[in-house]
């Protein structure tokens, strides 16, 4: 079971901007994920919860509002998805994360 981010890091202007990343499931099991941010004031993540099909990918959009240049990070917690799960946010509460992927975020002046 593996989950990777492509590209593996995010650089956006401190004045605001967005970046699209793919979460790629390299395994044979459907995965469920939750994304946590070290800076919820200046970053918006869509989606926060979701599923990634076996050998599939899911686009994640990172949007930054204007603010001082700063280093932050996203941590994607993931686990095998429950077989009957349809609501990722509700289902994630019932699983134990099996791994994480960290995406460093850099806001540049």
Swiss-Prot record:
Q: Residues in domain MSP?
A: 2-109
Under PROSITE patterns, the record lists: MSP
| Tissues with expression | Expressed at higher level in testis.
Q: Which positions are tagged coiled coil? A: none
The record ties this protein, via InterPro entries, to:
Ig-like_fold, MSP_dom, PapD-like_sf, Sperm-specific_class_P
Q: Which SUPFAM superfamilies match?
A: PapD-like
Stated name of the protein = Sperm-specific class P protein 16
Q: Which organism is it from?
A: Caenorhabditis elegans
